[in-house]
From Swiss-Prot:
Location relative to the cell: Secreted
Main location: secreted
Protein name (database record): Otospiralin
Name of the gene: OTOS
GO CC annotation terms, alphabetical: extracellular region
Organism whose genome encodes this protein: Homo sapiens
Length: 89
């Protein structure tokens, strides 16, 4: 059994570079730059009304996305992966 696997592995290693295989993604890393801060144009009470509505529907992934957008506007936004500009108090 091993006698068949060794030549097969050697053949794959030798023919691999000749196949010209390239990685699918040639550009830079899309996650290298932090995403822009999302915009939440509504009030806080609107946010909680949406949370209650999505809870009634059982749409928990949508609640997570909406919460990330809402809380990105507070100082803890940098912990969510967004670049928050420096704000003086």
């Amino acid at each position: 059994m091993q006698a068949c696997m060794v030549p097969g592995l050697a053949l794959c290693l030798l023919l691999g570079p000749l196949a010209g295989a390239k990685p699918v993604q040639e550009e830079g890393d899309p996650y290298a730059e932090l995403p822009a801060m999302p915009y939440w144009p509504f009030s806080t009470s609107d946010f909680w009304n949406y949370v209650q509505h999505f809870q009634a529907l059982g749409a928990y992934p949508q609640i997570e996305d909406m919460a990330r957008t809402f809380f990105a506007h507070f100082p803890l936004g940098s912990t969510l992966g967004f670049h928050v500009p420096y704000q003086e108090d």
